[in-house]
Design a protein with these regions (language model features):
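A short, hydrophobic C-terminal helix/tail in secreted or cell-surface proteins
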Residues: 169-187
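Sec-dependent signal peptide recognition
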Residues: 3-8, 173-176
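Short alpha-helical segments used as structural interaction elements across diverse proteins
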Residues: 1, 117, 184-188
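Bacterial N-terminal signal peptides
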Residues: 8-16
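Short, surface-exposed polybasic-aromatic patches that bind anionic ligands, especially phosphate groups
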Residues: 22-167
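The identity of the second residue at the extreme N-terminus of proteins
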Residues: 2-3, 22
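Sec/Tat signal peptide C-region and signal peptidase I cleavage site
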Residues: 17-21
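Short, charged juxtamembrane terminal tails flanking transmembrane helices
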Residues: 190-194
């Protein structure tokens, strides 16, 4: 009975997941005086990461040779890579230190132009896109729950635009797996106690 319940929950979670084609953002200018971020991306449709429709995502670009337009509307896919930047067709994997810098911006730094410039330059440096090294390239912070928002001018995977950062929740499949193992462990424990 428990196996069927767990299987039903797993199947329902897969079927209920939003399709990437419905993820869209509109880009607004934020703090910072570089040719990069901070940008503010307004979620227009389905949730993106921890953000719901109407929320603004404070974010930074990863590539110096990809572009976006303030006021532009873009389709979004989530990945662990900057698509057009770096080696091979799979793109450039997001560096863990870049994740730490982004989380430090979201959780610790005061959001102003000076700090935004430091974050953008540190991210570009970390990703091999130029920029300049500063104290942020050696901070210790969490690298968890950060993904790349790949922006597209047309439907997903059509018309490369910029790659930005976004915080995401713990993946649902991992959470369900942990819950499933917990239930299985409790059942096994009950059997061995008898």
């Amino acid at each position: 009975m428990v196996k069927r319940a767990i299987l039903a929950v797993v199947i329902a979670s897969v079927l209920a997941a939003p399709t990437f084609a419905d993820m869209k953002v509109q880009i607004y200018d934020g703090f910072g005086t570089t040719n990069g971020g901070e940008f503010r991306a307004k979620v227009l449709e389905d949730p993106i990461g921890i953000y719901n429709k109407g929320d603004f995502i404070s974010t930074f670009c990863l590539e110096t040779k990809e572009y976006l337009s303030i006021g532009g509307i873009y389709y979004v896919t989530l990945s662990d890579n900057a698509i057009q930047g770096g080696v091979g067709p799979a793109g450039d994997p997001l560096d863990d230190q870049s994740k730490k810098i982004y989380n430090y911006w979201l959780d610790t730094l005061t959001h102003n132009a000076s700090n935004a410039d430091d974050v953008q330059n540190a991210l570009w440096y970390q990703e091999g896109e130029g920029g300049s090294s500063n104290y942020l390239n050696s901070i210790t912070a969490s690298a968890a729950n950060v993904k790349v928002m790949n922006l597209w001018t047309g439907a997903p995977y059509q018309g490369y635009a910029q790659d930005l950062l976004v915080r995401v929740p713990l993946p649902g499949a991992v959470l369900l797996g942990v819950l499933g193992m917990g239930v299985a462990g409790l059942r096994l424990r009950r059997r061995t106690e008898r």
